[in-house]
């Protein structure tokens, strides 16, 4: 099939180069956005009388017909069309004849594809907002039933201090909230229309850029036609926000993987979210969180690919930009599937072993800070109290015992201000209960935050 630009050339394009150059294999994903973009453009050309009302209506009806055929499975874009834009234009011309050739008046594929991609990304961002909110709700429901469940808190993967399990789960909700906010900020910049910038310099054709922007739901237009077609920073921002989201999902996944090991035994996976081994019949594998953790790398890779793609590219549009779509499409699909999988996992796939969690905080030194705080409450300087407790920890380790195994006279050997009430302060439940600074793990604070999140998430 002859290219629309072929009259400039004496010889046909090499068949391999033709395939190498084509983007129809992946940019056909933009078909609905391209149709909407073209319909808005045709309406504008009719409004500005570049086209007669009859011509504009004929083009619009033709495009609507193509949309219906596509949605009903009667039209499938593909080769030999070079890209989705030519594919639709060729289909339109075959439907309505010569009038279809007037559709591209006053625009270029450069501003057209930029518009399509922004429309597509806007839809994906709106979908992510729903998916991330659903995941937050899943964590909140789990937190509500585990306010008084204790779990060891870690720093450097070493036991640090006991926590409310709900407090731990609420931390994920906070991270996901920042992810939502990042996507909203990306949407603000995505929601700017480049349509009408044409190839790079604008057009002498009488157009109304504000009309097409409004038709397509954009809040504003690009003020510089070169800038409108020259950058893919909005794509990079989307993948960057996605990479940060995946880092959080990967963090959550890693913890779940650890929790369900025999060594931790803090939780178990239900049959709905676990798989077995082809060789070892005893196995129950955490494939879902492992896959999410593994897929994080591909999103990171897409971010690096896009950053490299735009590095050193001069103004304005360059063919390099064709390489933006596959990373964008795969990133969007990856994060969507990972959020959905994590939501199912949290809703149906994990059961906490409350007894093991309770036993774990009863048999360690994670209450050491509270022992120091006890002395601080007796007017002992913190640094002195810290050193005293360090000596007590060493004493216990040498004898393979815990604080709770000491007698009061043993405590008093280290400092005279220890009294019988120290044993109450050392109970893990009381340790957690006492941490009532704002944002802390104390039960009052956790209940407060659960209630706050119920209001925010409309639960």
UniProtKB/Swiss-Prot annotation:
> Which InterPro entries does this UniProt record tie to the protein?
Arg_succ_lyase_C, Argininosuccinate_lyase, Fumarase/histidase_N, Fumarate_lyase_CS, Fumarate_lyase_fam, Fumarate_lyase_N, L-Aspartase-like
The annotated pathway is:
Amino-acid biosynthesis; L-arginine biosynthesis; L-arginine from L-ornithine and carbamoyl phosphate: step 3/3
Return the similarity comment.
Answer: Belongs to the lyase 1 family. Argininosuccinate lyase subfamily.
- Is Cytoplasm one of the keywords? yes
The primary gene name is argH
For the protein in the UniProt heading, the enzyme class is lyase
| Recorded GO CC terms | cytosol
Q: Which Gene3D superfamilies match?
A: Fumarase/aspartase (C-terminal domain), Fumarase/aspartase (Central domain), Fumarase/aspartase (N-terminal domain)
The name under which this protein is listed is: Argininosuccinate lyase
């Amino acid at each position: 099939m002859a290219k629309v630009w072929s009259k400039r050339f004496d010889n046909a394009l090499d068949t391999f180069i033709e395939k190498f150059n084509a983007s129809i294999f992946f940019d056909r994903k933009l078909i609905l956005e391209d149709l909407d973009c073209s319909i808005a453009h045709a309406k504008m050309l009719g409004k500005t009388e570049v086209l007669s009302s009859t011509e504009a209506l004929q083009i619009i009806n033709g495009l609507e017909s193509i949309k219906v055929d596509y949605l009903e499975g009667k039209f499938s874009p593909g080769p030999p069309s070079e890209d989705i834009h030519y594919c639709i234009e060729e289909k339109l011309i075959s439907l309505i004849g010569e009038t279809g050739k007037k559709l591209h008046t006053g625009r270029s594929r450069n501003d057209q594809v930029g518009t399509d991609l922004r429309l597509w990304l806007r839809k994906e961002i709106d979908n992510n907002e729903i998916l991330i909110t659903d995941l937050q709700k899943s964590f909140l429901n789990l937190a509500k039933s585990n306010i008084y469940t204790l779990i060891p808190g870690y720093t450097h993967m070493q036991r640090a201090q006991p926590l409310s399990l709900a407090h731990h789960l609420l931390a994920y909700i906070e991270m996901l909230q920042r992810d939502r906010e990042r996507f909203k900020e990306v949407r603000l910049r995505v929601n700017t229309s480049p349509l009408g910038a044409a190839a790079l310099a604008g057009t002498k054709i009488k157009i109304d850029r504000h009309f097409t922007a409004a038709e397509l739901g954009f809040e504003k237009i690009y003020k510089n036609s070169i800038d409108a077609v020259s950058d893919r920073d909005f794509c990079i921002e989307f993948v960057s926000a996605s990479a940060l989201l995946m880092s959080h999902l990967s963090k959550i996944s890693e913890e779940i993987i650890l929790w369900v090991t025999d060594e931790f035994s803090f939780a178990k996976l239900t049959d709905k979210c676990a798989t077995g081994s082809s060789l070892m019949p005893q196995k129950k594998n955490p494939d879902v969180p492992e896959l999410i953790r593994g897929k994080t790398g591909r999103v990171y890779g897409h971010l690096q690919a896009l950053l490299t793609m735009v590095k050193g590219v001069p103004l304005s549009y360059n063919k390099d930009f064709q390489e933006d779509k596959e990373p964008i499409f795969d990133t969007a699909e990856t994060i969507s599937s990972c959020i959905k999988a994590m939501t199912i996992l949290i809703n149906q796939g994990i059961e906490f072993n409350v007894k093991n969690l309770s036993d774990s905080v009863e048999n360690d030194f994670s209450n050491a800070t509270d022992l120091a705080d006890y002395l601080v409450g007796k007017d002992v300087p913190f640094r002195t109290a810290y050193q005293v407790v360090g000596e007590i920890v060493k004493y216990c380790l040498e004898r393979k015992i815990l604080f709770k195994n000491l007698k009061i006279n043993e405590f008093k050997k280290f400092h005279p201000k220890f009294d019988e009430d120290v044993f109450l302060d050392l109970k893990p439940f009381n340790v957690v209960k006492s941490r009532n600074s704002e944002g802390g793990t104390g039960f009052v604070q956790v209940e407060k935050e659960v209630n706050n999140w119920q209001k925010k998430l409309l639960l």
